[in-house]
């Protein structure tokens, strides 16, 4: 058997397991991980045809005996696109070096020795190149085999899911074929409603029509969902199938690109290389050993240097290129296969989702649909089930009648036996009463015998069953159902025939037994009369005890003999009648057993036929499936054949094209050869002519030697002069080319310098600096205000009219003048501008100074903004808000009472302007009028009818507020910007600062006399429709007691709208918006 081989899908490496044994599957995985440097958890092992190797399938001896050839090893990281796997180079190839003799004209001993070392290294390299080509070709084929196995694995997995999907579809189709959802309503209306089970009820009374409708709706909904899910899954399966076909085509493309067939030229080149290397090595050794004595060997080595060494280098270079190319092909194929494996993983994830849906969601939905169908099928099965129910009741009734009849007979027989036993015990007790003194004799027996009767069942007769059958027939129930019910009825009647037969036979036997019993009783009576007639049979006393006992024994013996004889006669007659009856019963039982055996045989044959039919169906489906698979494989083979033919045609066309190219090259070489031959012929002709001329010249040489020498010298001088002129022309041409290139570079540099110069000028003007000239013509950069006014900061137009610098226009004119000028002075003038601006760091220092000024200005402005921000924040914290109050605002709180609202005076108007409330009544606490001494003004100064008496400086820092408290006017100085606010406390006329009464927060009904009620409200200057009232708490009003005004920061706002049923303690009009406010006061 061939050894098993491990093949890695990552790089195509392989390892043979010829003599290795792995007791467990884990040992195999650990060996694979150590061999191919893969983590044990990431190893996936596949067999041929895409079968996964699992722990349960591993048996080293069994697999070895079965002849397992290959195990394909996959690293699970290959299927994860998030993990980058670097392509590992198992070895590197180095380009062969040139021979040390190739560039030398003379050869010595050292050169030959060095060349021999070079030849050994070259032989090793060529051998390595050949080995790497063969090994890489095998690894490429192994990787392609792994790709095929992976696609087979995906195909098997998809086929498994497709089979599961087809089973679900088949199950659903069977449910549709036998579905009760489309039939139950017709059966319910035409059969269940028509068939009556009594005078008031029909079969339809067993169901609730609403529940049946709900079940039908559930069936339709569930069936619709299942169909939609199956359609979606079908789309996914079809997509995976198409994706799988795409992957197969991609693998075929990879094969067509990557497969490198063995080339016979490699072996021929290697053999030729070895042959030439051996010849060169032998000649070199011989030359080294005999270099001083043999010129022939030296000449041979030199010839080999010119012929063998170039060929050796060419062959080694060819093998090197081929090895490098096949390694590069392998690397590209690794990347392509990695993308293929990632696509396989994605396709498998899609099919796994399909499988999960089929095994979980679809399975539960199928069970639910089956349950609903079974519930509706009860409507279809109820007519037959109810008929079977009636037949079962009828059968039980027949059995109950037989049971009752037999029970009554046995009760009468047992009653006779009981009476006889009672009589016998009385007789014995009468004869042997004396022994009861010594022994306990139990004489107790029940007086009657009774068998507990069974509970009575519902009475059903054949008339009711036949009437039910007639109703089913009139309701057009199928004949199959009626035939089944009639057969069950016949079977029930046959089941109760055997007990009747046994009863008849038992009646005959019982009559015979009764006759024999009567005869025995008569004989016992005659015997008893005979005993009474003999005096010696009477019981004796103590004196004649032995005689009496003996006599009694004799009498008992006689009685036993008589009784035995009579019993034998009876038993013989009973035995005869019983044997006859038993024979009849045995005949009947034999017939019944024959019929039952025949029935069992028929049932077995029927079950066998059914099983054969089911097996044939299974085989049929298997044949269909196998035919489908064979058709698929056949189509794949046809596709492969077409692809193969196409590939062969392409190769044939390529070969023909190659032959045509070779033919064309051959023709061209032939033409060249012909041309060379012609040239050789012409050269020979010329040579002959030259020979003739030579002869003529030799003849005339003596005469014209002096003249020729002079002409030669003149020609030599002319040649020398011409050579000098040619050299000068070549130097001029090269210098002209270089000068043109330098001129182009110079123009580009000048353009760049011009752009930099103009950009620098624009940059200076954008920061307010102007480049100008002084009296001496030197550049200077000065600060000019308003220079940036006309510049656009977002657009730089260095050629526009926005630039103000005179130097910019000068250098622009200079640049325009030197574009086509070849004079170097304008160019030097142009460069001088750049040196003046950048040579002495004038530009850098000006920009740095300007930015330092801007930075100091920015720091100054930042400091001023910070101070302004702190001052603004302080002002914001100290300001008093007069409208649109929010949490944290500082507000002015003022007291007001209900009496002020009733006065039509300037004071009430003033209070209305100051406060945001309008009270008709109040539930607040009442305080007495407060008087401020030494601050009373004449009443005439207050015009009650003129509202203009309100002061106009309400918003000023020092504000005078007029508040009416009785007939006294109070002035309050409010400083909003001062840290210590001046509050005015009011007291009574006696100068006491204590108020006359305290704030009462319990109830206003406890006041002894009507007093002014007061609340605290926020001052609003613009919007008087919204009311802001301080919450009535003990802390607030205790804190503000004896205060005329207060400033507090709002901590809470509760919005209220006056509506019917809403809280309105101040009797505001409807739809009035008012806020209940909490505040924090600073009264220090």
Swiss-Prot record:
Q: Which residue spans adopt a coiled-coil conformation according to this UniProt entry?
A: 585-739, 847-879
Q: Which Pfam families match?
A: ATG11, ATG17_like
* Species annotation: Kluyveromyces marxianus (strain DMKU3-1042 / BCC 29191 / NBRC 104275) (Yeast)
* Family assignment from sequence similarity: Belongs to the ATG11 family.
Any one GO CC term of the record: Atg1/ULK1 kinase complex
Q: Where is the composition biased (Low complexity)?
A: 940-949, 973-993
Q: Name one GO biological process term.
A: ribophagy
| Protein's recorded name | Autophagy-related protein 11
Taxonomic path: Eukaryota, Fungi, Dikarya, Ascomycota, Saccharomycotina
Q: How does it assemble?
A: Homodimer and potential homooligomers. Interacts with ATG1 kinase and the ATG19 and ATG34 cargo protein transporters. Interacts with ATG9, ATG17 and ATG20.
Question: Which stretches of sequence are listed as region Disordered?
Answer: 925-961, 973-1007
Places the protein is found: Preautophagosomal structure membrane; Vacuole membrane
Gene name of the record: ATG11
Please, what other remarks does the record include?
A: Kluyveromyces marxianus proteins are shorter in length and have a more ordered secondary structure than their S.cerevisiae counterparts, which might contribute to the superior thermotolerance and solubility. K.marxianus could be therefore useful as a new model organism for further elucidation of the molecular details of autophagy.
